Amino acid sequence: MLNKVSWIKRPQGQDAQADRSLTEKVSAIIERVKTEGDTALRAFSQQFDKVVPAQFEVSEQEIAEALEGMDAQTRRDSEFAINQVRRFAQAQLATMQPLEVETLPGVHLGHRIIPVQTVGCYVPGGRYPILSAPVMSIVPATVAGCEQIIACLPPGAHPAMIAVCHLAGAHRIFKVGGAQAIAAMAWGTESIPSVDKIVGPGNAFVNEAKRQVFGRVGIDALAGPSEIFTIADDSADPRILAADMLAQAEHDIHTRAGLATTSRDIAERTLAEVERQLASLPTAATAGEAWRRQGEIVLCEDEAQLIAFADHMATEHLQVHTRDPHATAAKIRNYGSLFIGQNASVVFSDKCCGTNHTLPTMAAARYTGGLWVGAYVKICTHQWIDEQGIPAIAEPAIRQSRTEGMQGHRRAAEIRLRPQDIDAITTGMRD
């Protein structure tokens, strides 16, 4: 079905000359932080950020000054976003319940929902002070009940970012960025405690560092550049389509923004509209380059092909602009987050509507969803078996163990079934 689509505008593709030494560079950073601790952090801070904080941890005085310096409306808007994310996370957590079930008489199985004890939230710097970034990683951790939540952000970050980290609920905040921050949270230093899980997006160095420390700690995901795709029919408004694509394109020159539509007229008008809006967009240097490199417009034959294309793309943000967007959306299965109808702009989720904006990219939506409160808890099973249940479980376990040749397993099962023969069983007299 996908071989029948046609392109009004094709993407150029990502730069094939990626830094092939990135893995080695990040590995060296991690190893140095592991062995040298804060000394390495100071060296990397000087090298990459051109500033070395007097202390890495943000003091109570610095937090107070950041809050004091925050514009009143900006604070209200940040608190609004925090409350929205908290409400949705609380509602999501409420869908996860402890379980206790008796599957056979005397055989009791269950699970508990246990918060991850310590979480490290990486807060990116980048070209903009994205005040919603700490909200998305910190607030769900507070809702989940994590005992210690730390945040790391580059030392040159805007003071408002520190203020929002505090408002969102971080227990401790550190002025350390990049791969060195990931290493510090994974292994611990004199100043920064090690954590159980690291969440939050970052640049290529941060992403690679998260990949390398996975296993030592848990991670949420490996995030690539931002993505937006809209599927649309002839009822869509090209002005809105263009505006939403450019809103994402201003993130980064590697952003992927696209449209798939059943209408050639909509496709061509949207292409023209992008150029018209770029002419007056203050961030056109970034957005225009992203559009030139990665922008695409695809013409599909019908809605079935639109849906197939959307599932194939498995994009981070998927907008649905059709006559019956809810009916269309119900047929789609691969997306990071779904934006149903033209009123549901990706921008609203990016900033404040309440769904988490940390989402799978690079087609990872085929097998995972985005960051949510469930990422901060463990669903851990348990079992207990009373006397009534022992025969039902022990007898097949004994037979299976014997078939597999696992005599230690067989013995451990059999002593439950025949406790009066425990000495004979454990000394091999019953083998």
Q: What kind of feature is each model-predicted range?
A:
Residues 1-8, 172-177, 297-302:
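Short acidic-hydrophobic, aromatic-tinged amphipathic segments that line or gate anion-handling sites
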Residues 1-117:
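N-terminal Rossmann-like NAD(P)+-binding subdomain of aldehyde/semialdehyde dehydrogenases
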Residues 95-101, 255-260, 280-291, 321, ...:
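Flexible, glycine/charged-enriched surface loops at secondary-structure junctions
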Residues 102-164:
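Conserved small-residue-rich beta-alpha loop and adjacent elements
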Residues 169-256:
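Conserved NAD(P)+-binding/catalytic subdomain of aldehyde/semialdehyde dehydrogenases
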Residues 221-293, 297:
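A conserved active-site cap/scaffold subdomain adjacent to cofactor or substrate pockets
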Residues 303, 311-430:
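C-terminal core of ALDH-fold dehydrogenases
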